[in-house]
């Protein structure tokens, strides 16, 4: 028995010596992995600090906070609430803070203390933890152990993340190479719960511990594994190692691993610590171990994983199994993947914050730009339409007087019998008429006559007004609807209590036109005139004794009242009051509109200042942070691209070949070195536009970006943009010769691409031969979106290639029609079938000479081979007036028709074919 124990111990010592060098090698590999992690963590931390500073500046600027640098905007919170709402979401901010502050920690779990100790010794080198024999394992009661970095070797008992316990340890009594077992075990007679839960904290001047802590879980009899993870997992970056010292997992092991998977969802590095035959998971023909099958059933592994732990097809679990302890250095690969996963997740969250807020800025810039353009037009439109309405109503009042007179006479004639009948049957209010027909007093007679008059006037009023409204109702559709909507929009954006005065005056104008009945029911001239006529009736009737109130009497009174009404006087009075009221309302409307215009003038001035600030400061600054976070995400996921041979040079960068990157091949890599802060911000903003565009078959795909901080030996920083690589550009294609049908199809492809950009609100600004790439089937894609910008974000800068630049580009005020102009020039080359310069441009000695000639109207000449319809399309596209250029939605069907006529019929134009 003694010989067997000695032999076993000897084998264990030999195994430890064999793995000692592997452990030191693994420690160095781990160190390199943590250096890689720390390098990119530092960049993430810097980006997060800059992001928090950006949001803090935005909050101070637009919240109206005391001492804010821009207090002139403090009162604009309601108008610019969208900017005020641009904040760092609390949930994302807390997550990112925790991620960048968390220190990596390796948790060593396992079936028993022997396996856990062997892994710890393998990582740290030497025999820090004693390796127990099989008999000792059964009664082991080890406490939790935590290894930390320190300038000198120290051992102490401490409660996790709290305080150190005063306790005399055996290790304090002298030097040691292996931690005494008495300090590792929890005494069976220990009654103090703090001492039973305390962990053994070991500080060592070990290089690996500078980057990571190591926690060895206690024996199950001392504390559950879940408690160890629960104490740490929320504030560390967890790397979980599970030491397997038996041939297979026990039922208790499986339950423990199931709990870890369900509760913490952490990947696990499984490693065998016993001396077994080589069992690498990647053996293609070998028999899989029982342990491997158990881990698949538990969901930690999936079939299709290679021995390096890389995921196979459909694999989502990054856990890893190594069946040789000598391969412990593979923990470096595993830990790098785990830490990289944390960095990628954080970079994705941070970039989502950047992109979401940047889109809000761009959308707000669109709103402000539109407001600056549309508000003056709305004011002018409202003024013009109100004038037209006023003049139309005045003309109506002039010519309607005679019509009103005829209308009143016609109405009275048509209603006479009905009015008389209604008057005869009328029941008086508040007047008691005796049943026997006895006469009533003069006062009561007067009241009866009043009520008969009210009946006649109300019926006449209703009939006349209905006919008058129908005669002018067309004005409602012609003027009122659109004008009212314009006013509502103008008053909505003018946040003042008196903002609805203009609408009220407009309503008065409409009231004068459509509600004429007020002139009958108020103390107006018409009413007084009618009253005078009624008084005359009363005087004729009441100079004798009071009459008997009978139906015949009521009918006679109504008859006299109707006959004494003057239709011409009524019509004249109606028109006079209508004109007077209309003029008063028109003058009040003009005054209130002027006041509204003054209010908008001040508001638009602030809007313009804010628009400039968003376009020149806020959006570019945030875009740079977005570029950095997205590039960090790309380099972590796909690595730094390998630069191949040079393909070409442009004004702002060099294009290289790149065999493959991020699963894409072949690729092209454009290296851009921004010379200053402005170019950095412009590049970042343009990169955001490119990344935001949906994929389209007529645009070259942008795969990703990487920021190279070591470019030029570290003297400068370069942005590497990785795109798909195509066969050649259109310039080379025309030089080598292309058929007519191919060239026209290329033109259609370019139009489709430009049309898509314009539909996305983006202007390319540099359409030319070298920015149209061709695949092997001669289908075209637009590239070099470096000058692309939404119209609302354009500063008016002069960009592009001189030959293709529209005249208005030099003024700084332009829109997406500059792309239509550039296409017209491009189409000239396509139809000519060559790359020879037009004569008008070839004669120019310099760019300035060329620009001056273009401004004066110089355009390419018509070649004899040109089809008439093609030439007309070119001329329309390069029209000097941007508003006269056709939209791409019009160009596309025209071009398709040309292609069908020239290429798909028997009467194919040979002239154009001759140019190939």
Swiss-Prot record:
Q: Name one GO cellular component term.
A: cytoplasm
Primary site of residence: cytoplasm
Enumerate the subcellular locations listed in this protein's record, separating them with semicolons: Cytoplasm; Cell membrane; Apical cell membrane; Basolateral cell membrane
Which reaction is this enzyme known to catalyze? Answer: L-seryl-[protein] + ATP = O-phospho-L-seryl-[protein] + ADP + H(+); L-threonyl-[protein] + ATP = O-phospho-L-threonyl-[protein] + ADP + H(+); L-tyrosyl-[protein] + ATP = O-phospho-L-tyrosyl-[protein] + ADP + H(+)
| Annotated family | Belongs to the protein kinase superfamily. Ser/Thr protein kinase family.
Q: What does this protein do?
A: May act as a positive regulator of ERK phosphorylation downstream of fibroblast growth factor-receptor activation. May induce both caspase-dependent apoptosis and caspase-independent cell death. May play a role in the embryonic development.
List the protein's name. Answer: Dual serine/threonine and tyrosine protein kinase
Species the sequence originates in = Xenopus laevis (African clawed frog)
């Amino acid at each position: 028995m003694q010989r067997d124990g000695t032999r076993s111990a000897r084998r264990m010592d030999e195994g430890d010596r064999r793995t000692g060098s592997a452990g030191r090698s693994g420690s160095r590999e781990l160190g390199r992995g943590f250096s890689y992690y720390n390098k990119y963590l530092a960049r993430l931390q810097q980006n997060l600090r800059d992001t928090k500073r950006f949001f803090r500046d935005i909050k101070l600027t637009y919240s109206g906070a005391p001492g804010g640098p821009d207090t002139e905007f403090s009162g604009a919170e309601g108008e610019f609430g969208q900017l005020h709402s641009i904040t760092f979401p609390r949930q994302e901010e807390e997550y990112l803070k925790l991620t960048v502050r968390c220190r990596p920690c390796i948790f060593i779990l396992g079936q028993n203390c022997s396996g856990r100790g062997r892994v710890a010794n393998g990582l740290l080198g030497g025999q820090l933890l004693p390796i127990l024999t099989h008999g000792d394992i059964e009664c082991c009661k080890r406490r939790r152990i935590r290894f930390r970095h320190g300038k000198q070797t120290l051992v102490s008992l401490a409660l996790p993340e709290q305080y150190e316990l005063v306790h005399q340890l055996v290790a304090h009594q002298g030097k040691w190479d292996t931690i005494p077992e008495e300090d590792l075990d929890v005494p069976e007679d220990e009654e103090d719960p703090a001492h039973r839960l305390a962990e053994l904290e070991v500080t060592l001047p070990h290089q690996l511990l500078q980057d990571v802590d190591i926690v060895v879980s206690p024996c199950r009899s001392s504390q559950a594994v879940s408690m160890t993870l629960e104490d740490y997992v929320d504030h560390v970056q967890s790397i979980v190692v599970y030491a397997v010292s038996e041939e297979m997992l026990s039922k208790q092991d499986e339950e423990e691993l199931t709990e870890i998977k369900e509760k913490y969802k952490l990947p696990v590095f499984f490693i065998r610590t016993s001396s077994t035959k080589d069992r690498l998971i990647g053996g293609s023909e070998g028999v899989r171990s029982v342990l491997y099958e158990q881990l698949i059933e538990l969901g930690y592994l999936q079939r299709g994983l290679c021995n390096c732990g890389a995921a196979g097809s459909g694999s989502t679990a990054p856990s890893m199994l190594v069946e040789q302890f000598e391969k412990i250095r593979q923990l470096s690969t595993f830990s790098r993947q785990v830490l990289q996963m944390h960095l990628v997740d954080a970079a994705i969250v941070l970039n989502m914050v950047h992109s979401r807020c940047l889109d809000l800025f761009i959308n707000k810039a669109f709103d402000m730009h539109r407001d600056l353009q549309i508000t003056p037009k709305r004011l002018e439109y409202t003024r013009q339409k109100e004038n037209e309405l006023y003049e139309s109503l005045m003309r109506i009042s002039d010519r309607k007087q005679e019509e009103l007179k005829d209308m009143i006479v016609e109405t009275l004639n048509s209603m006479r019998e009905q009015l008389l009948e209604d008057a005869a049957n009328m029941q008086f209010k508040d007047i008691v008429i005796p049943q026997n027909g006895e006469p009533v007093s003069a006062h009561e007679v007067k009241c009866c006559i009043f009520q008969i008059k009210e009946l006649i006037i109300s019926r006449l009023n209703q009939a006349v007004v209905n006919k008058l409204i129908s005669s002018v109702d067309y004005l409602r559709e012609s003027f009122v609807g659109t004008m009212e909507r314009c006013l509502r929009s103008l008053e909505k954006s003018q946040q003042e209590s008196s903002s609805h005065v203009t609408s009220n005056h407009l309503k008065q104008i409409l009231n004068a036109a459509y509600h004429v009945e007020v002139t009958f029911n108020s103390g107006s001239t018409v009413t007084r005139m009618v009253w005078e006529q009624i008084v005359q009736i009363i005087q004729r009737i009441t100079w004798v004794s009071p009459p008997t109130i009978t139906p015949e009497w009521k009918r006679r009174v109504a008859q006299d009242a109707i006959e004494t009404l003057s239709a011409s006087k009524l019509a004249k009075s109606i028109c006079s009051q209508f004109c007077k009221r209309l003029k008063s309302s028109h003058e009040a409307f003009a005054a209130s509109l002027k006041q509204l215009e003054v209010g908008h003038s001040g508001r638009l001035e602030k809007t313009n200042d804010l628009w400039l600030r968003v376009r020149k400061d806020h959006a570019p600054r945030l875009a740079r942070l977005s570029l950095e976070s997205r590039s960090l995400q790309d380099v972590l996921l796909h690595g730094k691209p390998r630069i191949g041979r040079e393909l070409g040079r442009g004004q702002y960068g060099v294009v290289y070949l790149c065999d493959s990157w991020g699963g894409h091949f072949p690729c092209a890599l454009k290296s851009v070195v921004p010379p200053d802060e402005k170019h950095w911000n412009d590049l970042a903003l343009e990169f955001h536009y490119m990344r935001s565009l949906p994929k389209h078959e007529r645009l070259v795909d942008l795969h990703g970006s990487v920021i190279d901080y070591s470019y030029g030996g570290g003297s400068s920083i370069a942005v590497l943009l990785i795109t798909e690589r195509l066969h050649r550009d259109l310039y080379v294609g025309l030089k080598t010769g292309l058929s007519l049908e191919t060239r026209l199809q290329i033109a259609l492809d370019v139009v489709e691409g430009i049309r898509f950009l314009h539909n996305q609100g983006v202007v390319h600004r540099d359409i030319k031969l070298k920015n149209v790439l061709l695949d092997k089937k001669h289908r075209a894609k637009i590239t070099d979106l470096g000058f692309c910008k939404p119209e609302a974000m354009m500063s008016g800068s002069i960009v592009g290639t001189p030959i293709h630049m529209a005249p208005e580009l030099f003024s700084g005020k332009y829109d997406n029609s500059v792309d239509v102009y550039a296409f017209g020039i491009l189409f000239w080359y396509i139809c000519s079938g060559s790359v020879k310069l037009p004569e008008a441009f070839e004669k120019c000695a310099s760019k300035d000479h060329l620009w001056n000639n273009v401004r004066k109207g110089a355009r390419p000449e018509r070649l004899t081979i040109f089809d008439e319809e093609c030439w007309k399309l070119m001329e329309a596209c390069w029209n000097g007036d941007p508003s006269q250029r056709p939209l791409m939605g019009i160009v596309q069907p025209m071009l398709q028709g040309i292609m069908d006529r020239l290429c798909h019929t028997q009467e194919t134009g040979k002239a154009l074919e001759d140019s190939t």
